[in-house]
């Protein structure tokens, strides 16, 4: 399980160093093999250990290619999916097209989200957090049943 937000730097080749606290579990779970793709709703990337990505692929394979909305999701997620292998120094090369899509420059936020990471441009991440907090504080909508049962 991945949690927490960590600022990491992209080097001139587009590689990021995976924080040490995640390296061992990633090597055990996926031998350092990862898959990166776009997020359909946010200006960030999604980074999955290969076994977790294979579960997503199975779910995507059950969608109908004849349904335009389902085909669109398949096209976007699978079409942007890029495999990356953690090297001996614990670095991952993020494809240039993906970096461009998410507006990633030097400073990047690696955000743990249970079974995957999100990759955000640092400034975009902080703005998103601010926007999310503002939205929660100003919302007039009742909490969903699931959120009502969540005790923090």
Swiss-Prot record:
MF-aspect GO terms: DNA-binding transcription factor activity; transcription cis-regulatory region binding
Pfam family, one: MraZ
Limits of the SpoVT-AbrB domain: 5-52, 81-124
Predominant localisation class: cytoplasm
Family matches, as HAMAP family: MraZ (MF_01008)
Source species, domain of life: Bacteria
UniProt keyword terms in alphabetical order: Cytoplasm, DNA-binding, Repeat, Repressor, Transcription, Transcription regulation
Function: Negatively regulates its own expression and that of the subsequent genes in the proximal part of the division and cell wall (dcw) gene cluster. Acts by binding directly to DNA. May also regulate the expression of genes outside the dcw cluster.
Protein biosynthesis in keyword set: no
Record localization: Cytoplasm, Nucleoid
GO biological process: negative regulation of DNA-templated transcription initiation
Identification of the protein by name: Transcriptional regulator MraZ
CDD domains xrefs: MraZ_C (cd16321), MraZ_N (cd16320)
Record carries keyword Amino-acid biosynthesis: no
Family (UniProt): Belongs to the MraZ family.
Database matches in SUPFAM superfamilies: AbrB/MazE/MraZ-like
Organism: Yersinia pestis
Subunit architecture: Forms oligomers.
GO cellular component: cytoplasm; nucleoid
């Amino acid at each position: 399980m991945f949690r927490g937000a960590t600022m990491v730097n992209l080097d001139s080749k587009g590689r990021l160093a995976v924080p040490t606290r995640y390296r061992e579990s990633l090597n055990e779970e996926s031998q350092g093999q990862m898959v990166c793709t776009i997020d359909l709703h946010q200006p960030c990337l999604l980074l999955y250990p290969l076994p977790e990505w294979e579960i997503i692929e199975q779910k995507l394979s059950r969608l109908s290619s004849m349904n335009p909305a389902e085909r669109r999701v398949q096209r976007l997620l699978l079409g942007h999916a890029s495999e990356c292998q953690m090297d001996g120094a614990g670095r991952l090369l993020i494809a240039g097209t993906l970096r461009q899509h998410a507006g990633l420059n030097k400073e990047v936020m690696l955000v743990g989200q249970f079974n995957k990471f999100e990759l955000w441009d640092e400034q975009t991440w902080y703005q998103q957090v601010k926007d999310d907090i503002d939205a929660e504080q100003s919302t007039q909508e009742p909490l969903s049943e699931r959120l009502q049962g969540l005790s923090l």
